[in-house]
Amino acid sequence: MKLIILVNMTEQKEEEHLKSTQAQDKMKAHDAKAFLVTCMDFRFINDEVAYMTEKGYSVNYDAFVLAGVSIGINQTQYPEWAKTLFEHIEISKSLHHIKKVVLFDHLDCGAYKTFCPGFKTEEEERELHVKELKIAAEKIKAKVPDLKVQCQIMHFDRTVEEVFVLN
């Protein structure tokens, strides 16, 4: 009886070790499809995750939260924000072999109202987002020229406008 229990325990430990090793191998081989930069606004997070899933990313991306996304990168009041973002992109590239950065702005953004007050209409705000996304994307390309930068804006009705991609 003792011998059978020991054999079963040994088999269980071997099986657990094998599962653990397989899990570790999966973790080592993990490549993320993208590095997603989203705003901290809680109203849009679920819709952004749903959009990324719909586009085939599931949750296979690294995520970074930055108030205002593009304006958060471009504003000068808190220069450490962009510095920290660029450091995280480099880490993601090194660890998870990302090939793309996705900048996901949204309209009705408090950071835009804080750093760029004065727009009066949805279209004025949208135009400002497009302008700031271009500047932010160019900054990212200057730091990591081998990565694509995809820029998009979520509208009030939760539709997503894919603005442009820098290759």
Walk through the language-model features, giving the residues of each.
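A short beta-strand-loop structural module common to alpha/beta enzyme folds
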Residues: 59-69
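Divalent-metal-activated hydrolytic enzyme cores
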Residues: 3-48, 67-83, 91-100, 110-167
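A short, polar/charged loop/turn motif at coil->beta-strand junctions and beta-hairpin connectors
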Residues: 30, 57-60
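Short, ordered loop/turn segments at secondary-structure junctions
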Residues: 106-108
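Short Gly/aromatic-enriched secondary-structure transition segments
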Residues: 49-56
